[in-house]
Amino acid sequence: MCGIVGYSGKKEASSILVEGLSKLEYRGYDSAGVAILNDGKINVSKCKGRLVNLENKLEENPIAGNIGIGHTRWATHGEPSDLNAHPHSNKDNTISVVHNGIIENYMQLRTWLKSKGYEFKSETDTEVIPNLVDYFYEGNLLDAVIKAISKVEGSYALGIVSSKEPDKVVAVRKDSPLIVGISEDGNFIASDVPAILNHTRDIYYIKDKEFVVLTSEGVEFYSNEGEKIEKELNHIEWDANAAEKGGYEHFMLKEIYEQPKAIRDTMTSRIIAGQPIKLDDISITKEQIENIDKIYIVACGTAYHAGVVGKYVIEKFARIPVEVDIASEFRYRDPIITKNTLMIVLSQSGETADTLAALREAKSIGARVIAVTNVVGSSVARAADDILYTWAGPEIAVASTKAYTTQLITMYILGLFFAQNKNTLTNEEIEKIKADMLTLPEKAEEVLASKEKVQKFAANTYMHKDMFYLGRGIDYAVAMEGALKLKEISYIHAEAYAGGELKHGTIALIEEGTVVVALGTQSDIYDKMVSNIKEVTTRGAKVLGIAAEGRKGMEEVVDSVIYVPEVNDMLLPVLSVMQLQLLAYYVSVEKGCDVDKPRNLAKSVTVE
């Protein structure tokens, strides 16, 4: 949520800032702006709406300069407007700030600053920052920022410039993402890697309450006591092309079709036929695994749905009790945690605020934490005891696809890893599941090559206002993800229900023409699922069925059925969900929705 870019270098800042902000559009925003230093003055241009509005404004009134900060805003305090857009400045426009996060004590700070003679123009929490920095400024911008931050409560990633020190950008973060990039042509700050990939792949990850001083000549890092510190430079392996559409109409479609490779990459070196599973970034011992008495899987949104699949997998493979929690609920419910409790957190970005808070809460009371994330060096990765990366590559579309399927792969890997250490599955059983896993990339390609039925169903149902998704067991977990995908990008009301719950109330919603998507991939409950489908079709529902090859009977009771290749039942969610992703995509396209940037949503939810 919100995107920050800062630059100091040899080139014109305006074009670099706008380009960087365009690479952060996936994070969600409602306004945009830049502040650029030139001839000892700060020039600000900002406006409500899409980034193109800012581009047009800068074309009409160009701003020269080689140092500046830019921002895309997601409204939290104050409505979307030109006035509330960032950057925000102090009264005499000598200090400008961009901010991602929430200042929790801004009302107290605002009242205190007003008592000191400061005035406020916007409704935002951010505006207290430039005024605080101004209050503490005594000739050194870094010192003033450190003192100002000592008064602030909440989350923040900040980029700050001052006409009093026009050669630098000062930045700091706490609970909101911020990286630093370096190159021969200049140096950068940004909320995420794609913003600066066209210029550099050499980056630093910033920890909470570490301060950055960025100039055209270099970068310096400081502790919150103002002491200089050294940081490790990291090199990003993927390049800017990975964050481009590559000929696809939308990022989401590209990322759906990248899933076979993402699945293969996530298994590489971890799932090898005839060899034990070895996880290099996980140090948990066999004895510790044997002593685990309970696992909490904690996540938000799509990652939560992957966690629900993980519950089925780990309990079946490793026979360990698993509870799945929404992160924003977990941290407030006083969970029962012992020294033998394991927490697994899932977060694509590694910066999800609620997940990070839940992780820290669990660690503070003694739980060991394994993080599953797609971003190396992210806050979640740094805070956890052990890490299991999903090698999905950059995911730009707001609606997650390949991050979800690779999270499923990590659940299978962990389930087998625990089973291997607890001896709850024989070596033969583990090898058989691994053999099936190794076929998933090829079978995923097969699924994605047959899209005609789902396209046709989308074309015939996109005008409906409601859709229902049904499943039993692990299929119910997949149904939840399918319903979320549809509502995220098509704005159609969609809900998932367990098949056995139909007669306990939900069936009252079924009438002539109601659209239902029914998953029946699990062999042990397939016949029961077919019976559930009959319950809705006899009441006039229009049903798309999804089943594994070799299952009989569904084609007789649904309007259309899509078969996915047969593998171990536990692995079928990887294949069946791809048809649900395609359904959501094609329904959204039929409706003319903004597939990659749906309304009101942000890719990375970095505020609670």
From Swiss-Prot:
Record-annotated Glutamine amidotransferase type-2 domain positions: 2-217
Q: SIS domain spans which residues?
A: 285-424, 453-598
GO terms for biological process? carbohydrate metabolic process; fructose 6-phosphate metabolic process; protein N-linked glycosylation; UDP-N-acetylglucosamine metabolic process
Q: What is its main location?
A: cytoplasm
Gene Ontology CC entries for this record: cytosol
As its record notes, the protein acts as a catalyst of: D-fructose 6-phosphate + L-glutamine = D-glucosamine 6-phosphate + L-glutamate
Q: Out of the domains of life, which is the source?
A: Bacteria
Supply the enzyme class, top level: transferase
One Pfam annotation reads GATase_6
| EC nos | 2.6.1.16
Name where it's found.
Cytoplasm
Which cysteine pairs make disulfide bonds? none
Kindly give the InterPro entries that the UniProt entry links to this protein: GATase_2_dom, GFAT, GFAT_N, GlmS/AgaS_SIS, GlmS/FrlB_SIS, Ntn_hydrolases_N, SIS_dom, SIS_dom_sf
The GO molecular function terms of this record are: carbohydrate derivative binding; glutamine-fructose-6-phosphate transaminase (isomerizing) activity
Note whether DNA damage occurs among the keywords.
no
Keyword field? Aminotransferase, Cytoplasm, Glutamine amidotransferase, Repeat, Transferase
Q: How does it assemble?
A: Homodimer.
Q: Which HAMAP family does this one have? A: GlmS (MF_00164)
Q: What is this protein called?
A: Glutamine--fructose-6-phosphate aminotransferase [isomerizing]
**The species this protein was found in:** Clostridium acetobutylicum (strain ATCC 824 / DSM 792 / JCM 1419 / IAM 19013 / LMG 5710 / NBRC 13948 / NRRL B-527 / VKM B-1787 / 2291 / W)
Q: Which gene encodes it?
A: glmS
